[in-house]
Amino acid sequence: MQYTLKQISEHLNAKVINEPSGEVIITGLNYAEQAKENDLTLIDKQEHIKLWQNSKAAAAIVSKKISKELAQVNDKPLIVVNNADLAMAKILELFSVPYPEQNGIHEKAVIDPTAKIGKNVSIGPGAYIGKNVEIGDNTIIYANVCIYNDAKVGTNCIIWPSVTIRDRTIIDHFCRLYSNCSIGSDGFGYRPSEDGRTIVRIPHIGNVVIGSFVDIGSNTCINNAKYGSTIIGDYTKIDNLVQIGHNVIIGKGCMICGQAGISGSVTIGDGVIIAGNAGIKDHTNIGSDARIGGKAGVMWDVPAGESHMGYPAYKDSELAKQWIAIRKLPETMKKLKAIAKSLNIDL
């Protein structure tokens, strides 16, 4: 797979500076420090300029704000764009390896006769499609996927091997579910018995509702609602190994990073980012455009637009004061002991 520099710049509708007289062939994409002679790289930050100086890459996609400075480093061609990261995403699509070819319904797929299968749907070997399931047009279902009774999957979805979609789940259009994720398992609902000697299981009779253009990473679990629905909004992206409890409501355009845990009945607004390994206490509310730092432990509501981090999580500006105070604590104790000694007081 290869493209000329001209084809790439035209695909981005972008200007080239240090444009060469001859044709430049691009055969791959890589980081500046790892790039080979026919690779295209990305330079989008001031601190990456030094990497470009020593890079073997044939050309770079660069942010407009640093393009003039970068053009003086050497005479290699630069494709200038407003947002280099988003531009590179478009080029990554050009170089993406096609999905494994799968046409039609495999003879070893098990499909209940009551299921409704749309046009141009592909279903791989070992897949199970239960009673009254609906699959939209152009959806690809790979090997060993299980979709249980009364579930609905929209159009143009891609469901990778060994995904489990439980009863009554509703998934809208253009979603991607990666291998081994589990959608609609019972929530962790248990209560001590009246005598306190055993644990009583609470049935979960609701469902999971997933909007359009949602990505769900490998080994992520989204639990069924006790009643009502666990809801994931349009365009939300969920990493691998994320746990989402029963009756959680997540808004549109959120990003949830790996190993985050969201307890039952949490409500999350639109555009929220939750970093890796963060934990959210049950029945809390996270406002739209909030940011939750890595390994944060959120114990109470987070207002819209605020950044919270640490354990327990506080607003970033408040937590910074705590960190400064802790760093000063040894010196403060030293001074306090000196004062106590001068006053003949034991600490």
Swiss-Prot record:
CC per GO annotation: membrane
Disulfide bond residue pairs: none
InterPro entries for this protein: Hexapep, Hexapep_transf_CS, LpxD, Trimer_LpxA-like_sf, UDP_GlcNAc_AcTrfase_non-rep
GO biological process, one term: lipid A biosynthetic process
Molecular functions (GO terms): N-acyltransferase activity
Secretion signal, residue range per the UniProt entry: none
Catalytic activity annotation: a UDP-3-O-[(3R)-3-hydroxyacyl]-alpha-D-glucosamine + a (3R)-hydroxyacyl-[ACP] = a UDP-2-N,3-O-bis[(3R)-3-hydroxyacyl]-alpha-D-glucosamine + holo-[ACP] + H(+)
EC number(s) on file: 2.3.1.191
Active site: 246
Listed pathway(s): Bacterial outer membrane biogenesis; LPS lipid A biosynthesis
Keywords assigned by UniProt, alphabetized: Acyltransferase, Lipid A biosynthesis, Lipid biosynthesis, Lipid metabolism, Repeat, Transferase
Alphabetical list of PANTHER family matching this protein: UDP-3-O-ACYLGLUCOSAMINE N-ACYLTRANSFERASE, UDP-3-O-ACYLGLUCOSAMINE N-ACYLTRANSFERASE 1, MITOCHONDRIAL-RELATED
Membership in a protein family: Belongs to the transferase hexapeptide repeat family. LpxD subfamily.
Complex and partners: Homotrimer.
Function: Catalyzes the N-acylation of UDP-3-O-acylglucosamine using 3-hydroxyacyl-ACP as the acyl donor. Is involved in the biosynthesis of lipid A, a phosphorylated glycolipid that anchors the lipopolysaccharide to the outer membrane of the cell.
Listed name of the protein: UDP-3-O-acylglucosamine N-acyltransferase 1
Source species of the chain: Francisella tularensis subsp. holarctica (strain LVS)
Gene, per the UniProt record: lpxD1
